[in-house]
Amino acid sequence: MFDFLDKNNIGKDYKNFLLISIDDIPDYKAKGIYLRHKKTGFEIYHILKDDKENLFAFCFRTISKDNLGTAHIMEHSTLCGSEKYPLKEPFTTLSSTSLNTFLNALTYPDKTVYPGASVVHDDYFNMLDVYADAVFFPKLDYATFIQEGHRLEMDENGKLSIQGVVYNEMKGNYSSFHHVVFDEQINAMFPNSYPSFESGGDPLEIPKLTYEQFLNFHQKFYNPDNCLLFLYGDIPTAEQLDFFDERFISRIEKKYNCKNEIKNYDSKLPLIKDEIQELKKLNLLEKSSYKKVIAPDSGATGNFVSMNWYTGKVDMEKYYLSEVLFGNDSSPFSLALKTSNLGDDVNCGNFGQFAEEFFSIGLFGVKKDDEQKVYDLIEKTIHKIYEDGICQEDIDSAIMGIDFYLREVNRYFGPPSIQIMEKVLKSWMNGNACNSNLTPISSFEKIKQKIKTDKNFTKNLIKKYFIDNKVIVKFVAEPSSKFFEERNKSESELIKNLEKNLDKNQLKKDLDELHQYQQHIETPEETSCIPTTKLSSLNSKIERPVTNLQFIKGFDGSEIPLFVSKEETNGIFYLDVLFPFDRLEPKYFQYIPFLSNVITNLGWNNKSWDECISESACVMGDVWGKFTTGKLSDVKEVQDYISKYKDYNFYGRQWLGISCKALTSMADKTLSLLAEIITTMSFTDKNRFGTLVQELISEKKAFLVDSGLDYASKRAKCLLGPLQALSEILNGISQLYTVENYTKNSLRESLNIFEYIYKECLKSGGIVHITADEDSLNKILPLLEKFVQNAKITKLLPAKKITLEELKPYISQNDAIENKNIQIINYDSQTGYAFVSSPASEYLSKESASEIILASWLKSHTLWDKIRTTGGAYGSGVEADSLEKTLSFWSYRDPNPEKSLEVYLESLKEICEKDFPKEDIEKTIVSCYGDVIVPVLPKDRGARSFTSMIYGISPDFKQINLNNLFEVTPQDVKNAAKRLYDLSQKQNQKAIFCNKSDKSIGNNIKIPL
């Protein structure tokens, strides 16, 4: 048996895979195994770790050299059928029948990555099989190219338009000020190099891509000697190599004519073709430059102005310097920018996506004539910080922040292994050792030693990266209403030029063939080629995280509920202190979101806000405000469950909270400071409050387009009940009107309101929740009674009942909602969002289980075909929510959102007559089960368990829901379709988020910002 961890085997091969190196990776408690196939050049790096969530990722170096978006269209198209899996979209079939915890495809400026992850052994290999066949043996037929990339469509009047999934997705990208700004800033830093090109594609360039160019791209880049396969998890290396050897190696050798061993197959470093190496070269500026561009005015509050410096290859010292200068609002550079009154939002840091990194210091919301003032401020601040030096408190807070970040595991975009993959690919892609970036903890320990022994260490970094760094790129982006006008004009010209050489008969033939291809419904026999996990092999018992309820003596002598979640948190504890806001008059609810944002940012105990933030950064990992809303189901099981502790008044409440996370070694200081924060909160600093208002407006405007679906969903459902109305008031379009009012009301008036709300919430009593590991709990639990006393937490008072009628006056433009069931949110955007909601069955019922299965089936079959494949939207979805008793449909980045509204209800009607094959239903149940078993990080498991408990959801109920899912039959699903269709005809609510130029009949809603 070949031992891949025996260093004596380095230089030996296993089934033609040469073992090049074995790396110890103590920072991740793992080993790294680097291999290269001697004949194909195929490289593998396996991080072997005791983690059942295994991940694979095929990576190809696909270097952008233009804005055609070829890599992006290829990423979509490879997943649309292959030799072994000749379906329309095996990716969709796979994702709808597998237990994946992550399944995606990602396009970067320099690479394309195809990752998948699962906690189930057989399911992992099923996904690996489909993906390997897709990337090496795709169909790439013409129909796929024009469906995913671009095509001309002709309406009934003969009018031409450009369509395509990628085309419409990227139109959404070009609708956002911030998206365009960051792309253009990178363009300024790396002119005529691959980062300066839009790897996703510019919609004005995408239609110029030919089918021949598309095929040549795959031939050029999708070769085994340009493929890097990243593996992670506990499945043995030998088993993975056996799989590849049995399923793919001989086929790859035959297709790519790999007869002999490749040159330099035993190279210790990654092999990169000369042609690709040339494409990867970065053209760095040799002297300072200035660039000004225009960007869409949607999402902008003024100009974006920045200064930028090249900083070289990746290293930890730049991360440390960035944390010192910009880590929080009180950090020296952040403070100077935020208090300058020259802009409303800071954008600073070391940007490390490429082989050459760069520091950027910038401000959003700058007035047109103030750009030189910003540059003067930045230069002045650099020299002042350098000359005065960095205070010890800023260094300590930076060290605390980085230590905390390196210890805490987070699940940002998929499993934590995705973050490790990114680190590996950054070095591997560029010809460096795969483990180069896998020593963050040990690298930072070296930095800390340098800080201790060299008092000028931080100062010298400022000199190195700023004072002595003479190439400076100054960049300005100006929002302009002409941006869309010019792009729309260019699009019209593009269509005219395409029309000149157009054979309309050939176009009609191509479109007829495409539509026929799209409308083909694959039979169970056809889809049976996709490997699946059998329903009978699944474990029907769910993980049961437990939050225990204890009581500690409150400030008033009462019993205060203490919720304790024991999880493996690696010496970190997470503490939540919640106070109900549901005893307030409804007119105050609208202020809760911003209040939760500012309560830890205004200062406390008569200290300035920056002094307070600096103090907390030296003690805690973070401290923040939040709000939590929800409701209790009225079903008997839930009411019985809550009966034991009902008199303690914590079930089904609406909460304002203050949370923190800290190292257990800092528990005493953390609890003391948190009690001080809660009891001495300040609401006096008008200047700071004004700055936070401007930041809020900037943030809301920046994410308006990206949040379009959220706004549409909340608007559509806002009259279904009190909780939905509250959600619209707190998070919907109505909240944007509240945000606008902060600029109209006096700052003192708003602060008085906030202070009143905060004090009233504290008077209403509170509860405490902690998530920590056993050792941490043993230390911290004995300290919590003193903390509760110091924080003056008292017995919870009962909630006041809130009705829908009481909330309606605080829903903006509510008078027209009941008269017109289509809510139309108008905003400058080149794509839109659609949302429809209708009634569904109640929590814990067998009917709700069948509706969940129906929704999942609809999402991956009918709606995927009609909304995405045929309609050209980037995506669509369906959800049956039994707690809310709603069925919801939606689309996003949709070229025709109003039409999608019709498709949803038509689709529901169509499937009422459908007979569902048993195999289809079982596959869908398997997919839904996959959603249940996605690994949850310990801190999140504790938070979820606590939230479930206070809203009356016990682990037993989750088990009942899963049992009900397992028992769903095809007839149950058919009955669900008929039931939901009948309910939708009696009541449905619709909303779309679309361009102002779209003419739709309904209640038109203007966005105030």
PLM segments and residue spans:
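M16/MPP (pitrilysin/insulinase) zinc-metallopeptidase core fold and M16-derived inactive scaffolds
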Residues: 48-133, 175, 196-199, 327-343, ...
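Non-catalytic accessory/assembly modules
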Residues: 7, 81, 139, 143-179, ...
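Structured mid-domain segments that build the active-site/substrate or prosthetic-cofactor binding neighborhood
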Residues: 303-393, 556-567, 573-648, 747-751, ...
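His/Glu-based metal-binding/catalytic segments typifying zinc-dependent metallopeptidases
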Residues: 45-52, 57-59, 167, 171-172, ...
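C-terminal regions of mature proteins
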Residues: 2-10, 233, 398-556, 560-565, ...
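M16/insulysin-pitrilysin zinc metalloprotease superfamily fold
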Residues: 81, 116-158, 162, 252, ...
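Non-catalytic terminal extensions that flank enzyme cores
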Residues: 2-55
